[in-house]
Amino acid sequence: MAAEIRVFTCLKDNFGYLVHDSDSGATASIDAPEAAPILAALAREGWTLTDILVTHHHADHIGGIAELKQATNCRVVAPHDNGAAIPLVDLRVRQGDVVKIGGLLARVLETPGHTLDHVAYVFDDDKALFAADTLFSIGCGRVFEGTYPMMWESLLKLRVLPDDMRLYCGHEYTAANVKFALTVEPNNPALQARAAEVAHLRTAGLPTIPTLLGDEKRANVFLRADEPTVAAGVRLKGAGAVEVFTELRERKNKS
């Protein structure tokens, strides 16, 4: 049976995600920004937390681990390259590993750039990509620990996934991302359509996630830094993708 996925808010603008296998009863939380909303979502559904899949070591993604571990004795799965930054880790994973959540399979992709230890979890059978702070809808994460070329390569890893893959990202930043992207590609019809959709969703108080990766490939300027229209939009006609991506990210940092 397909995974059941629940989306809710943690902290100010983090997304909380539960991924449930109804056949086995196993449930994973993608990251653990804070415990209370995750425990509340579990209680609403009548689910038991069996796993936390950690994407990276930033505090707003791991702050609830200790309380959740104490409450549920769940397994904590985390990237291998993080030293002691992530607490109570039971299983460390790297590129190509597959984590079992009951009968569900989560494939690990290393996506460094935002942090050096960042990973994404891909549920191929369920067409679900949990990209955390590497790829946002119509945006990408800041480059805190890695380099711009490293982050671009990580985005390319995600871009090759199927168009019907659903993107679940780390934060509700989509409205701000759309505003910035329209300064680069104001005449992109896919971006214009996404802008209208996002405005409707936010007015209704609804999350802008999930979105389809195929739509992101057409509308997200950060995924399209190798497109001539994006290069022209930042006055770098003829420049290489890394140079264009760097300019995009630095402009977004200042916006």
Swiss-Prot record:
Keyword Metal-binding in annotation: yes
Organism: Rhodopseudomonas palustris (strain BisB18)
Record GO biological process: methylglyoxal catabolic process to D-lactate via S-lactoyl-glutathione
Subunit structure: Monomer.
EC number of this enzyme: 3.1.2.6
Similarity section: Belongs to the metallo-beta-lactamase superfamily. Glyoxalase II family.
One Pfam family here: Lactamase_B
Keywords tagged on the record: Hydrolase, Metal-binding, Zinc
Record's catalysed reaction(s): an S-(2-hydroxyacyl)glutathione + H2O = a 2-hydroxy carboxylate + glutathione + H(+)
Residues at which Zn(2+) 1 binds: H56, H58, H114, D133
Name recorded for this polypeptide: Hydroxyacylglutathione hydrolase
InterPro entries: Clx_II_MBL (IPR035680), Glyoxalase_II_hydrolase (IPR050110), HAGH_C (IPR032282), Hydroxyacylglutathione_Hdrlase (IPR017782), Metallo-B-lactamas (IPR001279), RibonucZ/Hydroxyglut_hydro (IPR036866)
Functional summary from the UniProt entry: Thiolesterase that catalyzes the hydrolysis of S-D-lactoyl-glutathione to form glutathione and D-lactic acid.
CDD domains noted in UniProt: hydroxyacylglutathione_hydrolase_MBL-fold
Keyword DNA damage: no
Molecular function via GO: hydroxyacylglutathione hydrolase activity; metal ion binding
Alphabetized HAMAP family for the sequence: Glyoxalase_2
Pathway: Secondary metabolite metabolism; methylglyoxal degradation; (R)-lactate from methylglyoxal: step 2/2
Cofactor: how and how many bound: Binds 2 Zn(2+) ions per subunit.
Cofactor(s) this protein cannot do without: Zn(2+)
Binding site for Zn(2+) 2: D60, H61, D133, H171
